UniProtKB/Swiss-Prot annotation:
Signal sequence region: none
Protein location: Nucleus
Domain of life: Eukaryota
One term of GO molecular function: ubiquitin protein ligase activity
Organism this protein belongs to: Mus musculus
Protein name: Mediator of RNA polymerase II transcription subunit 17
PANTHER family: MEDIATOR OF RNA POLYMERASE II TRANSCRIPTION SUBUNIT 17
Gene giving rise to this polypeptide: Med17
Protein family (similarity comment): Belongs to the Mediator complex subunit 17 family.
GO cellular component: core mediator complex; mediator complex; nucleoplasm; nucleus; transcription regulator complex; ubiquitin ligase complex
Pfam name, any one: Med17
Role of this protein: Component of the Mediator complex, a coactivator involved in the regulated transcription of nearly all RNA polymerase II-dependent genes. Mediator functions as a bridge to convey information from gene-specific regulatory proteins to the basal RNA polymerase II transcription machinery. Mediator is recruited to promoters by direct interactions with regulatory proteins and serves as a scaffold for the assembly of a functional preinitiation complex with RNA polymerase II and the general transcription factors.
Sorted UniProt keywords: Activator, Nucleus, Transcription, Transcription regulation
Disulfide-linked positions: none
Region described as Disordered: spans on this chain: 51-79
Upper taxonomic lineage: Eukaryota, Metazoa, Chordata, Craniata, Vertebrata
């Protein structure tokens, strides 16, 4: 067998990997073999650090044992060296375990020492005093020192905390003031239209999107505010974003509308500086650029309104032509009446402010008409947007409405002109100015009559629901103390643009012009008729009989204002009669007729011999009305009727 050549046989284990799981279908799941690092970790986990090493026990027992003989020392040492040489190692990680254990012990000791020194909870290090303290004072002194140190430590902790809080609050405030440019730009985009052109950010102030046709571009530029030093304290009104608007839109502007009775000389007209309003203040909490842009947009709108009014003033053909001089438009709605519309634009420079301060005058600006001008221009914008009609069907090209309606049923030129004829901005504002002036003149006339004439009383009840071209007022003429029985005169005045329409209680309608004298004469005649109507109502209440009544008497002196009214009433017994004549200018005249038997100055007649003729009423006698007692006309008349009525008792 020794001569046979050896054959190498490869022997493999039946299973190189451990089986983790065998499935129901016979599939085996194997565990992956450990890598070198995982194998090293598995071996390190087997280290038992609680067991002591044999070398430490021998070192501990060596000093305690007896010293060996000097004679046999060399032999024993050789024997031990031989044993050590041939003694196998107890464990390969023994030295590593020992070094880690000693390092852990040293780290624990170092941690304890540092904790005691830092926290001072477990130990307090005090310097050793040279002189020994008295036994009685030492405990109190130590206690006082410990209290002082504890209080000082607590105070230092509180001061450090307060300092940290102060720093945090200051940092928060600085962060709020130092707002980011992008966040401000986002806020600006929420309110205004922006677009980026190259490296610039441009915005739009115009009303083109709302239907405006004003040619001004109204473009502003958004810039970054770099005029502040970030190293210094930041002011409260600092904003990293700023806007740059055109120079012609800076400052503030408004449209002044005034009505003057006397027109000045045309040669004196020119560019007037009527700006008396303070510059708009920014709202609390709103950025300064918002106020700046709103003021610029308002200037642009005022310029558009004035341009539209100037264009219409030149184009409209009227009996009295409108005058346009620089920043003023002058019109005459009524004779001796002037309507002035001015564009007042004030920039932020000091010169314009000084000019406005040097020329104080009476404020006659009509804020209602200014507000109505803004409403009218917005309505004009809306009409511009709605005038474009979409084609039907949608695929058809755009075209004007009257072109699409042309055909067999097409309108002629006159019908088209009547449909398209609309009032302009200037015509509407002139009509509103006429109505406002006529309404104020009517109110002034009624107030002057009410303050000048005490009997009868005139009352005006203005309606709260009015139109821009029409207002209504209810006029009541009454006597004090007799309001329930004297309700005959009730007038409804409908104030229009050029006329006043008067509606009586019985439905009669009278048209009055814009002249103040016509309304005054009409009210005076109605007040005169009220006295006669009051006597009629009083006679019915007291049982007197009305013999005659007339609102327009043809006898007697002619009144320059209206006509006189008259009434004649008789007592219940028929013995007495009272005749009242009242005129707007002549006033009241009262006559009383007595029975013949009470008239001593009548001449005796030979014809009337029978006594029955003595019961007839004699001639009229005038009453001295000024000497009658009573607070008003109706009260005096009541006293007169009571005196002439027979006593029923």
């Amino acid at each position: 067998m020794s001569g046979v050549r050896a054959v190498r046989i490869s022997i493999e284990s039946a299973c190189e990997k451990q089986v983790q799981e065998v499935g129901l279908d016979g599939t085996e799941t194997y565990l992956q073999p450990l890598s070198m690092s995982q194998n090293l970790a598995r071996l390190a986990q087997r280290i038992d650090f609680s067991q002591g090493s044999g070398s430490e026990e021998e070192e501990a027992a060596g000093p305690d044992g007896d010293a060996p003989d000097w004679g046999g020392a060399g032999a024993d040492q050789d024997d031990e060296e031989g044993l050590v040489k041939f003694q196998p190692s107890l464990w390969p990680w023994d030295s590593v375990r020992n070094n880690l254990r000693s390092a852990l012990t040293e780290m624990c000791v170092l941690y304890d020492v540092l904790s005691i020194v830092r926290d001072k909870k477990f130990m307090t290090l005090d310097p050793v005093s040279q002189d020994a303290l008295p036994p009685k004072q030492s405990p109190q002194t130590l206690q006082l020192i410990s209290k002082k140190k504890s209080l000082a430590g607590a105070a230092q902790i509180l001061l450090k905390g307060a300092e940290r809080l102060t720093k945090s609050v200051a940092e928060n405030q600085e962060n709020k003031l130092q707002r980011d440019f992008n966040s401000e730009l986002l806020r600006l985009r929420q309110h205004w239209k922006l677009r980026k052109v190259g490296d610039k950010i441009l915005g739009d102030l115009s009303y083109r999107s709302a239907g405006s046709l004003f040619p001004h571009h109204g473009t502003f530029e958004v810039i970054k505010n770099t005029d502040i030093d970030l190293d210094k304290k930041i002011p409260e009104d600092y904003c990293p974003l700023d806007v740059q608007i055109p120079s012609d839109l800076e400052g503030s502007a408004y449209i002044k509308v005034s009505i003057q009775k006397q027109a000045p000389d045309i040669g004196d007209l020119g560019t007037v500086n009527l700006f008396k309003r303070p510059l708009p203040k920014s709202k609390p909490g709103s950025p300064h650029w918002q106020t700046k842009l709103e003021a610029a947009q308002n200037v642009l709108l005022c310029k558009e309104i004035f341009a539209q009014l100037s264009r219409e003033a030149v184009q409209i053909k009227s009996q009295i032509p409108h005058i346009v001089v620089k920043n003023q438009i002058i019109s005459q709605p009524f004779p001796s009446l002037q309507l002035s519309i001015s564009l007042c634009h004030s920039s932020d420079d000091k010169k314009s402010q000084k000019c406005a301060a040097e020329k104080p005058g009476q404020e006659d600006h009509l804020y209602v008409l200014e507000h109505n001008l803004h409403l009218l221009i917005r309505e004009f914008h809306k009409q511009t947007l709605s005038s474009i009609v979409m084609p039907h069907p949608a695929s058809a090209p755009f075209g004007h409405k009257r072109m699409r309606l042309s055909g067999p049923q097409a309108f002629d030129k006159n019908e088209i002109n009547s449909i398209q004829s609309t009032e302009g901005l200037l015509e509407k504002i002139i009509k509103q100015a006429k109505h406002i002036f006529l309404r104020s003149r009517t109110a002034a006339t009624i107030d002057s009559l009410a303050s000048r004439i005490e009997d009868p009383q005139i009352q005006a009840h203005w309606s709260n629901i009015n139109d821009v071209y029409e207002s209504s007022v209810k006029v009541l003429i009454t006597s004090q103390g007799y309001e329930q029985i004297c309700k005959s005169i009730q007038l409804q005045l409908n104030i229009g643009v050029e006329q006043v329409r008067v509606v009586h209680r019985d439905g009669r309608v009278i048209m009055l012009s814009h002249q103040e004298q016509e309304l005054q004469d009409f009210l005076l005649s109605q007040m005169s008729q009220h006295q006669v109507h009051a006597v009629q109502q009083l006679a019915k209440v007291m049982g007197w009989q009305v013999l005659s009544f007339s609102n327009h008497v043809g006898l007697g002196p002619i009144e320059s204002i209206g006509n006189a009214s008259a009434i004649t009433v008789a007592s219940p017994s028929g013995d007495y009669a009272i005749s009242v004549r009242n005129g707007p200018e002549s006033g009241s005249k009262i006559m009383v007729q007595f029975p013949r038997n009470q008239c001593k100055d009548l001449p005796k007649s030979d014809v009337l011999q029978d006594s029955k003729w003595s019961h007839l009423r004699g001639p009229f006698k005038e009453v001295q009305w000024n000497k009658m007692e009573g607070r008003n006309f109706v009260y005096k008349m009541e006293l007169l009727m009571s005196a002439l009525s027979p006593c029923l008792l």
